[in-house]
A protein has these predicted regions:
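Secretory targeting and sorting signals
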Residues: 1-35
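Active-site-proximal beta-strand/loop segments in catalytic clefts of secreted hydrolases
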Residues: 75-80, 168-172, 224-227, 249-253, ...
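Short, polar loop/linker segments at the starts of domains and inter-domain junctions
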Residues: 85-97, 258-265, 337, 357-358
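Extracellular hydrolytic enzyme modules, especially secreted metalloproteases
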Residues: 159, 172-331
Length: 414
């Protein structure tokens, strides 16, 4: 997961051009508009062979689907070349209940991640420096680390009881690199207690850790891709694809709730909460972060949670445009700007290759410089009273009003 780098103040000359115009209909309205009754399946992109493909037509059975309670074991690893200065309880508290709370809110209560942290350190057989831990870890050193960790823990852990495995290293050991935290996917699974272990989250975070870092890595366990852009030389801005708008882009984002597309993929949205738009359509979009009873920007906490969360326009065999409302609610409580967010989805793009890219409705301005991970996209949503035509696709969205509960009324014209 990337750490923040200095951000350039100048906008890229490659910024997209938009057409903005004010709308007259900005008053509150009390009820939803009629949505075009197209089946969500008509806009469900097909899952491809790309790593962590954004296809939503089927679930990849190689990954656990987070639509029930899943159990996660946290194994704390110490090394002969260091005496831990923290306790397993302290490290567990770095990540829980924050990680479970994030997923509870993101899933509208449909998924619970239940942690099972060990209460003691488990000693690795070799010094931390011998594993040459780093971000771009060599396969041989990584294999040594995982093999030793599994062998050391197997006497104390029944791995057959758990859906997710976290190996948490002593953050103060000299060979531990906090930039190396990641999910390791194994072509040949490790075997313990009669069960295959196909992926492990290797945690090397400092104490205290980066915000929501474990939630980001756990997203990979559920087949979600990296949405950040990694510069070839390691320098420059990592957040040009999605900015603050999804945890899989940055765990530091102001609005880190998972995209509606990801909630659809994970099984947290009912088909009726996704509208496939094939002709001019008026509909009401609930704020993505609002579950049943969740207040939205001080508005009453009623009437939201089970309505439409995502509108989709199919643009090609492997591409689509997605529209969702982002307001200060739930995991998005700290959002910089609210409105209707527009983004492109590419099912054929692999993790890290831009499978989702936010489209900036205000390409000549930026916002929240002091807090945003990428200010040029912090004001990307189409605001109340604005219209926006998506460059290259000629799809227009008009944000016409708000309901008393805080939902957004929009018209989408493909």
């Amino acid at each position: 997961m990337p750490r923040p780098f200095p951000r350039p103040r100048l906008r890229s000359t490659a910024a997209v051009f938009t057409t903005m115009s004010a709308l007259a209909a900005t008053s509150l309205i009390t009820g939803p508009s009629a949505a075009e009754p197209f089946s969500a399946a008509a806009c469900a992109l097909t899952r491809t062979e790309a790593h962590h493909s954004e296809g939503v037509d089927t679930w990849n059975a190689a990954y656990p689907q987070p639509t029930r309670t899943l159990d996660a074991v946290m194994v704390f690893l110490s090394f002969p070349d260091a005496t831990p200065r923290t306790t397993p309880d302290q490290l567990a508290a770095d990540h829980f209940p924050a990680t479970s709370r994030f997923f509870e809110q993101a899933s509208y209560g449909r998924f619970t991640l239940r942690p099972h942290p060990l209460r003691n350190w488990i000693r690795m057989p070799r010094p931390s420096t011998s594993y040459v831990i780093e971000r771009d870890w060599s396969a041989s050193h990584r294999a040594d680390y995982l093999r030793d960790a599994l062998a050391a823990a197997d006497g104390q852990v029944d791995f057959s009881r758990y859906d997710v495995v976290y190996f948490v290293a002593d953050p103060d050991a000299p060979g531990v690199d906090s930039d190396a935290t990641k999910v390791v996917n194994l072509d040949t699974p490790m075997r313990a207690d009669g069960t295959d272990i196909r992926r492990v989250v290797t945690v090397f975070e400092q104490h205290p850790p980066d915000r929501l870092v474990l939630a980001h890595e756990t997203g990979h366990v559920f087949d979600l891709p990296d949405l950040y852009h990694r510069p070839v030389d390691g320098k420059g801005d990592w957040d040009t694809y999605v900015g603050d708008w999804d945890l899989m882009g940055s765990q530091f984002g102001l609005a880190p709730d998972l995209f509606g597309w990801h909630k659809w993929k994970l099984g947290w949205l009912d088909p009726r909460q996704v509208t496939c738009v094939g002709k001019p359509t008026r509909l009401t979009l609930e704020p993505l972060g609002a579950g049943p009873g969740t207040p939205v920007a001080g508005r009453p906490a009623f009437g939201l949670g089970r309505g439409t969360k995502l509108a989709v326009v199919r643009t090609g065999p492997e591409t689509a445009l997605a529209f969702e409302a982002r307001s200060p609610a739930g995991n998005d409580a700290g959002t910089c700007k609210e409105g209707v967010l527009v983004y492109r989805v590419r099912a054929g793009a692999a993790s890290g290759g831009g499978p989702i890219q936010v489209i900036d409705a205000h390409p000549h301005t930026e916002a929240c410089w002091e807090a945003s991970v990428y200010p040029p996209l912090a004001d990307a949503p189409v605001a109340l009273g604005e219209s926006f035509t998506v460059p290259g696709d000629d799809v227009r969205v008009e944000v016409e009003g708000r309901t008393v509960a805080g939902a957004w009324t929009v018209k989408i014209t493909p």
